[in-house]
Amino acid sequence: MKVIDQDLLEKVIIERSRTSHKGDYGRLLLLGGTYPYGGAIIMAALAAVKSGAGLVTVGTDRENIPALHNHLPEAMAFSLQDQQLLKEQLEKEEVVLLGPGLRDNAFGEDIVKQVFASLSQNQILIVDGGAL
C-alpha cells in the first residue's frame, strides 16, 4: 500500500507545460455505471479529469453517455455492451478503473472476468465498487 503524503503529492502534482496536451498525461479507462448506477461512473470520471488524468475514456451503459458528455464533454465514451470496442480499449489504456456503479449481476461479472483476462502486467488496475 502506498501512503499519500505531502512529499508524494509534490512529486505527482507538477506545473504543466503550455505546449503539452492531455495525451501527455496518461490514458485512463473507467468501466461501470450499469443501470441503475450511472451517476457513480460520471462522478468517477469527473474526479479523474479534475485530478489531472490525461485521456479519459468511459465504458458504461449507452443511456449514460449523454449525461456524461453534459458534465464532461472532453471524455470519450462507449457502450459496455460493445465487446469488441471494450477489448480494443483494454489493450491500449495505461490505467483501468473497474467498478464504480457496476451492477452485481451476470453482465457485471462477465465484464470483471474480461478485464482480468485482458490486462497485461504493465497496466494498472484499480478495482472499486461493484467489481469487488
Where are the predicted features?
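Small-residue (G/A/S/T)-rich helix-start motifs and N-terminal tracts that mark the onset
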Residues: M1-L125
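Active-site ligand-binding patch in enzyme domains
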Residues: L132
